[in-house]
């Protein structure tokens, strides 16, 4: 049995019968967790264990757990800094910022792995132009090289803990003001302008071995009329062929307003998969998930299944939290990360991405 091309969410802190029915469907290959799915560490570990036990080929479990405003699990987890705080340190001490970024990635990933989560949709590789409120302090910096250096360090820290990284939002969401959760943003720059700036960290992260990518629900009309997540130009010609990316591609949530361009939910899923996504996310609308499961008919290629299988967390890096706390590596990382950026994080804890998933 192999992973299907759909990633769905679940209703609460434990699986209900409808969750089990949906997740057992052959089309489903993953689950994304939200803050509503978390009560405490023991409950999360039990939920992940039950999800993984549903199929012979365990479902992928992913989460948006970046730090700052976007951290689904808080009580019982280390409060991670907003990535902009690492960029501020970079301005004065680049090497120190890289070290802290790697430690942040390690703490992020090791705590998630200890509870059974396979991967986080992180790091954010968008540039901080100061225009986008939905990106904002989720971005490391305005300088493409700084974003790459810090993003690579976070990725390496995640790898140290047995977790693959997923960069987002290809080819860059930071320049537009509109929020793709509630609108369809349009970036009217030329491909040359984008390639000289926003594409740089994505290109360098591909060269550094990034395992997965999430495209933006943004239209770049000078390149293609389709939003990037539905565009064969962006996903096949540029990402796969020109940049040489051979990792997994996850759509952003296809229930967001930025995805409405492609039609109804079944049409959105088909369009995303046809464009080059390996897994399509359908979140926060169980009735739409049921519609997709009833109507979607896809011939799922073996290379896509293989790319997704590489996103499973490494089993050798999944100690219990008790064992993790006794680890010298974790203790050292925690010493550096705990409290980092706390002042800026506490100014605004409203999650700009969790419109329907907020507990």
UniProtKB/Swiss-Prot annotation:
Keywords: Cell cycle, Cell division, Cell shape, Cell wall biogenesis/degradation, Cytoplasm, Glycosidase, Hydrolase, Peptidoglycan synthesis. It is found in: Cytoplasm. SUPFAM superfamilies: (Trans)glycosidases. The record marks 179 as: Important for catalytic activity. This is Beta-hexosaminidase. Substrate binds at residues 64, 72, 138, 168-169. Plays a role in peptidoglycan recycling by cleaving the terminal beta-1,4-linked N-acetylglucosamine (GlcNAc) from peptide-linked peptidoglycan fragments, giving rise to free GlcNAc, anhydro-N-acetylmuramic acid and anhydro-N-acetylmuramic acid-linked peptides. Its main location: cytoplasm. It comes from the Bacteria. It comes from Thiobacillus denitrificans (strain ATCC 25259 / T1). GO terms for molecular function: beta-N-acetylhexosaminidase activity. One of its GO terms (biological process) is peptidoglycan biosynthetic process.
């Amino acid at each position: 049995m192999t992973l299907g091309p759909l990633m769905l969410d679940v209703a609460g802190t434990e699986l209900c019968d409808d969750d089990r029915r949906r997740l057992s469907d052959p089309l489903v290959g993953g689950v994304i967790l939200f803050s509503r799915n978390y009560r405490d560490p023991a409950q999360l570990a039990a939920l992940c264990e039950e999800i993984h036990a549903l199929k012979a080929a365990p479902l992928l479990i992913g989460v948006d757990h970046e730090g700052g405003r976007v951290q689904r699990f808080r009580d019982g987890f280390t409060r991670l800094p907003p990535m902009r705080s690492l960029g501020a340190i970079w301005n004065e001490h680049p090497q120190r910022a890289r070290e802290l970024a790697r430690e942040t990635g390690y703490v992020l990933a090791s705590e998630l792995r200890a509870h059974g989560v396979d991967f986080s949709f992180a790091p954010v590789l968008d540039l901080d132009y100061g225009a986008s409120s939905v990106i904002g302090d989720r971005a490391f910096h305005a300088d493409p090289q700084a974003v790459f250096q810090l993003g690579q360090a976070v990725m390496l820290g995640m790898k140290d803990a047995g977790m693959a990284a997923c960069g987002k939002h290809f080819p860059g969401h930071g320049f537009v003001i509109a929020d793709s959760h509630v609108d369809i943003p349009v970036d009217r720059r030329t491909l040359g302008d984008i390639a000289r700036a926003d594409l740089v960290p994505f290109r360098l992260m591909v060269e550094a071995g990034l395992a997965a990518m999430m495209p933006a629900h943004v239209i770049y009309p000078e390149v293609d009329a389709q939003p990037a997540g539905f565009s064969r130009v962006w996903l096949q010609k540029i990402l796969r062929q020109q940049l040489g990316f051979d990792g997994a591609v996850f759509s952003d949530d296809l229930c967001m307003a930025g995805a409405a361009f492609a039609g109804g939910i079944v049409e959105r899923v088909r369009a995303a998969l046809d464009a080059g996504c390996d897994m399509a996310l359908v979140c926060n609308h169980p009735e739409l998930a049921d519609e997709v499961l009833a109507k979607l008919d896809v011939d799922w290629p073996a290379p896509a299944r293989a790319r997704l299988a590489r996103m499973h967390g490494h089993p050798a890096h999944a100690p219990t939290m008790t064992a993790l706390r006794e680890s010298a590596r974790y203790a050292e990382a925690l010493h550096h990360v705990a409290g980092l950026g706390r002042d800026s994080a506490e100014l605004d804890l409203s999650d700009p991405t969790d419109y329907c998933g907020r507990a």
